[in-house]
A protein has these predicted regions:
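TPR-adjacent "capping" and linker segments in tetratricopeptide-repeat scaffold/adaptor proteins
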Residues: 1-10
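Conserved alpha-helical positions within TPR/SEL1-like repeat arrays
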Residues: 12-20, 43-54, 77-88, 111-122, ...
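Fe(II)/2-oxoglutarate oxygenase catalytic core
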Residues: 258-499, 505-535
Length: 535
């Protein structure tokens, strides 16, 4: 079809005007009319793709914009739009590639650098995301959002001093930013400076009294300082402002747990899990072992006929009418604890058969495994719904059954890990608590190495002046310390329904895992931490 250049331009200009006014259907017709007249035209095909994106038709949008870019790959805005659609469609790797194409054409485009950083974070490429933000700040040193985001990312990378420096630099020129005062408070807490952290949060609340995130962080830090009533008051204020604020429910659960109010604590944890994870499923960019677990769990639920309850599909987990912790271990375990140095006690047949079976059913059927680790295992934490009344019953009975071990230590935190069949396990670390309880609930028949699969504990404790980041995550420092002090290991093989109870400050790691294939054969361990680490 022949048409003058002026006619085509006039039609396209009309389409753009209608598009800008939100008249998508009329704009679409004009774009299509231009394409009929000039099929090789880049601009109308690109803009049709934009309309498809606005209509939520992402697959068509990707096809249209990609086709336009084949005709003219030198338009940065089109690469940006393609990246935006790919990001919305759940394709972060493709989106990052498109944003990089745009940056080749416009290297200092702050919008694109921000978008690229966001996709790199989705991909877990935090160092690369930091590089993108650094490029943005090199071009735009005064970009407030980028500076704040850089601080947040440095905190995620556990580079706390650098994060604090970014927040301080930003607050020097913009002391009115309540969010940044809040972030500063969080990183000061990470650095073990809770009193300074509270002052920073108070600055945030002075600027914005209804800032729920600051109130929630304030409650978290007050709990760390054992100021439990104040913590509950701060968290109540946060939840009055944002009743569905998951983090505040989680912090409330931790506070109530240390106060000894486990039923109420676990209700708060469950609410946090429902708010955060009810609709979450592994996406296309999830780890392969996470996707495999999702499918295996679906198949198990279908085959077993289990009907889950609530948004997290909780299977079982109710309190049992009788005891769950066996009494026959009591005197021997307490005596062993009193006499052992270092404090390490192994208890076999910890729980009743009924309790073990109920816990296995709960762990197999409930959708609570929401924290994947690249090494090949999944975590279930209280805030993701790992808060069954049966777990509270176990925690309570442990305290009253083994009084010499637990003394007055309350339950501080708990979690579970579920592993792939063949792994090295979790690396060396110590935990932020007084007493560590680690028990296992997968049948012995699943363990292909009866002499392994359990726990390795060193007979030397982490130095008391080491901070959490060092004793919990710095493996090199731990091994150097142990070698220097001639530490020896205690290797405890895996056994179903075996508990290892030990001083949480002792360095330990999961032994190498060699379990049979199959969903029900996955190694599951449950950890409960009691009390606070010595200072």
């Amino acid at each position: 079809m022949n048409a003058s250049r002026a006619t085509l331009q006039d039609l396209f200009d009309q389409a753009i005007a209608l598009h800008q006014q939100g008249e998508l259907a009329r704009a679409e017709r004009l774009y299509q009319q231009v394409l009929l007249m000039e099929p090789a035209s880049f601009a109308p095909r690109h803009m049709l793709g934009v309309i498809r994106f606005q209509q939520g038709r992402n697959a068509e949008a990707i096809d249209l914009i990609a086709a336009a870019l084949q005709q003219n790959p030198q338009v940065a805005a089109a690469w940006v739009n393609l990246g935006n659609v790919q990001a919305a469609a759940g394709h972060p790797e493709e989106a990052a590639a498109s944003y990089r194409k745009a940056l080749q054409l416009e290297p200092a485009n702050s919008q694109v650098l921000n978008a690229l950083a966001a996709q790199l974070l989705r991909l877990g490429q935090r160092d690369e995301a930091l590089s993108a933000i650094d490029q943005l700040l090199a071009a735009n040193p005064g970009d407030i959002e980028a500076r704040n985001n850089r601080g947040n990312l440095l905190r995620d990378l556990k580079r706390y001093d650098a994060a604090l420096a970014d927040y301080d630099a930003l607050l020097t020129v913009r002391p009115d930013l309540a969010e940044t005062w809040t972030n500063r408070g969080a990183v000061l807490c990470d650095l073990g400076r809770p009193e300074e952290a509270l002052k920073s949060l108070d600055r945030a609340l002075g600027l914005q009294p209804g800032l729920a995130v600051a109130l929630s962080s304030r409650g978290f830090i007050q709990r760390e300082l054992a100021r439990f009533d104040e913590a509950l008051e701060s968290l109540a204020r946060a939840l009055a402002i944002e009743p569905d604020y998951a983090a505040a429910h989680g912090h409330r659960g931790k506070t109530l747990s240390e106060m000894g109010h486990l039923p109420e604590s676990f209700q708060s944890f469950l609410r946090a899990g429902e708010l955060t994870y009810a609709a979450r499923r592994p996406g296309p960019d999830a780890f392969a072992h996470e996707q495999q677990h999702e499918q295996e769990q679906k198949d198990w639920i279908t085959a077993s006929g289990e009907v889950g309850q609530g948004p997290l599909h909780i299977v079982g987990g109710a309190r049992l009418s009788g005891r769950v912790v066996n009494l026959h271990n009591r005197d021997g375990a307490d005596k062993a604890w009193r006499e052992s140095d270092p404090k390490i006690v192994v208890i076999d047949n910890l729980l009743t058969d009924e309790a073990v079976a109920a816990l296995r059913r709960y762990c197999l059927g409930s959708r609570i495994w929401h924290t994947p680790y690249s090494q090949g295992y999944l975590g279930a934490f209280p805030e993701s719904g790992f808060a069954a009344p049966l777990l509270a019953q176990v925690a309570e009975e442990l305290s009253v059954t083994f009084k010499d071990i637990f003394a007055t230590h309350p339950l501080r935190y708990h979690w579970a890990f579920k592993y792939d069949s063949h792994l090295d396990g979790i690396g060396i670390h110590a935990d932020e608590a007084a007493v560590n309880v680690n028990f296992w609930i997968t049948p012995d028949a699943a363990n292909l190495d009866p002499d392994g699969g359990g726990l390795v504990i060193w007979d030397k404790a982490a130095p008391l002046d080491w901070g959490f980041a060092k004793f919990n995550a710095d493996e090199k420092a731990a091994y150097d310390f142990l070698a220097k002090n001639g530490a020896k290991t205690v290797r405890i093989p895996y056994r179903a329904n075996r508990a290892v109870i030990f001083d949480s400050n002792l360095f330990h790691k999961t032994d190498a895992i060699d379990f049979a294939e199959g969903y029900e054969n996955r190694r599951i361990n449950i950890t409960m931490l009691y009390g606070r680490r010595r200072r």
